Amino acid sequence: MQEALSILLGDEAKGLSPAVLGRLKAEWAQEYAHWQRRSYRKALCLLVGRRYLYEPPCGEDPRICLLVIIGVTAEGKKELVMVSDGLRESKASWLEILRDLQARGLETAPLLAIGDGAMGFWAALDEAYPETGQQRCWVHKTANILNELPKAQQSKAKAALQEIWMAANRQAAEKALDVFVRNYQAKYPKAVAKLEKDRAELLAFYDFPAEHWRHIRTTNAIESTFATVRHRTTRTKNCVSRSSFLGLGFKMLQQAEKRWIGIYAPEKVLQLFAGVKFIDGIPANLTLPDDQQTAA
C-alpha cells in the first residue's frame, strides 16, 4: 500500500496513521464513484479498451480484472474515459460499461477502437457501437503469433511481421502478409491462422491519417502506465476492499493521465470528424490512382 500511496502523495505518504489512510481511501472511493456518474457528452476519435489482470482483494472472484477505456477527443487529447472491474474476457462486463457511457452522453460512435484480440470487448463493441472501426494491437498479435513458433524461427518471423505493419500502404502490407502466409503455412498453421483471423482489423489503420499510425497500430502508448498501476495495485491486494481498490486504481490512473501526450497532427482529427476519407494515410482527394502511383 505504501508503494502505491507514494505515487499519489510523494514523501507525505510516509508515516501516515491508519486513521488518515482510512480517510484517504474513503475519499478516493467516493471521488471515483462520483467520476463514474459524470456526464460524458464528447465526441471520441479513438477508443482504447484494455483489461488488466491482477490479484483481486481478498474474497473477490479470482476472474475479476480491471477494465479501462482511454479516449482521444476531437482536439487530439488523450483522456481517461472509464475505469471499472469485470470478469475476464466477458462480453457482458464490457457491454455494461459501453451502455453506461451511452447513457451518460457518448451517443456518437467513436471512429476507431484499439485493443488486443482476446477480449469480450469486441463482441460488446459490435453491439453497442457497430459503426466503430476496429484495429487490433500489433504488439499483442505479434507476441501471440511468435508463441506458436520455435524460438529459432521467432526472430525471422518477427522481422517478417514488421514488414507488414511498417509497409507504406495497404497494398504493400497485403503483399507482405501473403508472403508470411506462404512461408509459414505448411509448418506452422496455427501461427498463420492467428494472423489471418484478424487480417482486416490489423490493417484498419491505413484508413486514418499517416501521422496517427504510431498511435493506433498498437496500445503501447498506454501500456507503461498500466504496467505500473497493475504492479502497485497487485501489491495492495490484502489491504483494501473492492471499492477502495477501484478508488486507488482510479487515482493512480488520473495521476498518470497528467503525463499523457496528445496525438500528432490533432488537426487531422477534425478532418476525420468532418467526414474526410483517408486512403493509405492521405486524404482520398489527394490520393493518386494506382497506375499513376506506379508510374511515379
Curated annotation (Swiss-Prot):
Q: Name the UniProt key words of this record, in alphabetical order.
A: DNA recombination, DNA-binding, Transposable element, Transposition
This protein's record includes keyword DNA-binding:
yes
Q: Any idea which GO molecular function terms this record carries?
A: DNA binding; transposase activity
Q: Which InterPro entries match?
A: Transposase_mutator (IPR001207)
Presence of keyword DNA-binding: yes
What are the recorded Gene Ontology BP terms?
DNA transposition
Tell me the protein family, please.
Answer: Belongs to the transposase mutator family.
What is the annotated role of this protein in its UniProt record? Answer: Required for the transposition of the insertion element.
Matches recorded under NCBIfam families: transpos_IS256 (NF033543)
- Name this protein carries in UniProt: Transposase for insertion sequence element IST2
